Amino acid sequence: QDSGRVPYGYVWQGRQYEGLSCVYLEMIEGFGGEWLTPETGRVGLDQAPGIAATRWLDDLIEAGISPRAVTNFSESEALQSFKSGQAAFMRNWPYAWAELQKNDSAVNNKVGITTMVAQAGEKPAATLGSWGLSLLSGSARPESTVEAFKFLTSEDSQRYLYTNFGYTPTQNALFNDQDLLQNHPSLASIGEALSFARSRPETPLYAQARDVLQRKLSSTLTGLTSPTQGMEQAERSTEQVLE
């Protein structure tokens, strides 16, 4: 960015929606904190790591490393910006890799994958996605559904889905498949990132808690409140939700 090769250094999901929650989870964990500890009900937003995570995101915008428009970015806007060569780094989900290798991508064959940044001495974090397969207890065809699950999660199916559509496999064996790694070396980096996957807070009140975080964090990123004020309000409101 300083050399003028790209307009921006980093693009991510800054819109007031679930993507912002995922970004924040990775940052607070990377600063050594925790959004919410389900076992104790402790909220960590107004603690040093929570404030530092918010300030780090806010500073990206204030310093011009991220565009101010990032507060309106979802996955697609971030991907389009990076895909067109407008930013040096991007935070996104693994599916983006396949998109970046298409013929209309300005960065085709010029992209690498790494883990999220973290403060020195802390481990990086990667928000666990929400896709999964489930069987309703009242299903009329449970046996055939289970067979479909087995087929979709088999090594052969996951190899096909990854090589053709970029869907990240869940079978550990595929991350050590030498033939697959030879043709898709990025898979090793994806596997490393997955080792740091973290779930969003496991609480029946998650929808309400995430709404609080998104509103308060968005308020800070758009310049209405300071990081300290925003997280103080977010923690207080979250505690009220959990009462």
Where are these regions (language model features)?
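Glycine-centered hinge/linker elements that transmit conformational signals in sensory
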Residues: 1, 39-71
